[in-house]
């Protein structure tokens, strides 16, 4: 992906005042930028007049940068440089790719000449602000009889899902990054019995189960019938599947599908994934 385009249409004065924007709007915007930079996406395109986008009922982005309160609000002092960079070069309208004679629409609304239309023309991703009608992914853009689905992000980690769907991110990297910092950790997974066992036929089930674990609290995980979370028992037939140190931590498992299972141990509220079982080999003996 050559870059990301900021969606000026996602700013319509939705932030109540300067403090609301600096405290609630720009921090999420910054987290999305960090995701892009971590993947090596360095170009942040925007329309040339983006500085004039209406962020609050009475202030544009330029106003927010130059207002006296920008020197007082802690978040403003922290993020001013981020916003300043966001309203500067590169501008996509220096070299527009959209057809000037075509009509681009979203939900029957004309968006020709906007960053939404440009993202469709360039096949790149949009970055939108929160609290707007553009909190959805994908954004479907029509150009006559032609329809284009434009990836759209407005909070952290969404970019990785879009890159994965576009085939620009491997399954292993997507899962590792997507679920990092939460209840799942894949840093200890076995190379032979790990990601290499996930294919096109079962990957959605794995991702759905990981997402479920991430969303539920531990009390709900333990009692959820779908996950069937339980202790895996050590015996003469099962002991060789894990090291003595891993057994001492207490091996657990949860269900991916009727046959597939995920094994690991829990430490400080994090499930460290060790391996998968796709043929009930482990489940049948422990």
Predicted segment positions?
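Active-site beta-strand-loop-beta-strand hairpin of nuclease catalytic cores
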Residues: 260, 265-273
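Short, solvent-exposed loop/turn segments at secondary-structure junctions
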Residues: 259-261, 278-279
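Active-site-proximal segments of catalytic enzyme domains
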Residues: 214-253
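An acidic, glycine-rich, mixed-charge low-complexity segment common to nucleic-acid enzymes
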Residues: 1-215, 221-225, 229
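Compact nucleic-acid interaction/catalytic patches
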Residues: 106, 270-286
